Design a protein with these regions (language model features):
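Transmembrane helix-loop-helix hairpins at the membrane interface
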Residues: 38, 50-170
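Juxtamembrane helix-loop-helix connectors linking adjacent transmembrane helices
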Residues: 1-65, 83, 113-121
Length: 170
């Protein structure tokens, strides 16, 4: 299952990155652009070379979010909803909440006018991250282990960071 998790994470990261470029170019409506801009608010990160920047961003992206989010969403949250409403409802509810939570990475954007909602790209981002949630759940269920979902999530995040550093640049 690890090979499947790695393949799914890489494919999803590349696909979502290029969909953003195709639809929105390098504008603030592109989810990876706003993620990049958020990551690079710190001048110390902007001063790093590409390899150092990749390492500085990829290591925490591969560890903290995947472990914390998967233990919560595919572990605690899905278990509670499954007991209350069954596995299909749990899968759909988990995907919806996971997708909506990620609006804080893209969709609600800080601009010179203050906090702005970008409704169309935000909706696309929420649906894409809900789709990621479905993929993580599928891996969790079919492998019998939450660690396949953690692995896929980590690989997706690292692929996203690589896409940001290599394709979008600083």
């Amino acid at each position: 299952w690890i090979g499947t998790a790695i393949s799914c994470g890489v494919a999803a990261g590349i696909l979502i990155g290029f969909v953003g470029l195709w639809w929105y170019g390098e504008s603030q409506h592109n989810w990876f652009v706003t993620v990049r801009d958020t990551m690079l608010r710190d001048a110390r990160l902007r001063a790093l070379g590409s390899a150092q920047l990749f390492a500085a961003l990829a290591v925490p992206a591969a560890i903290f979010s995947p472990i914390g989010e998967e233990l919560f969403f595919r572990g605690v949250f899905a278990t509670i909803v499954t007991m209350a409403a069954g596995p299909v409802a749990a899968t759909l509810c988990t995907a919806a909440v996971f997708g909506l939570m990620h609006i804080f990475h893209h969709g609600l954007v800080m601009s010179s006018a203050g906090l702005e909602l970008q409704p169309f790209s935000a909706m696309a981002w929420v649906l894409l991250t809900a789709g990621l949630s479905l993929m993580f759940t599928w891996l969790r269920v079919h492998s019998g282990s939450i660690w396949s979902a953690v692995c896929c999530h980590a690989v997706f995040n690292v692929t996203m960071v690589a896409f940001i550093v290599i394709i979008l640049g600083k």
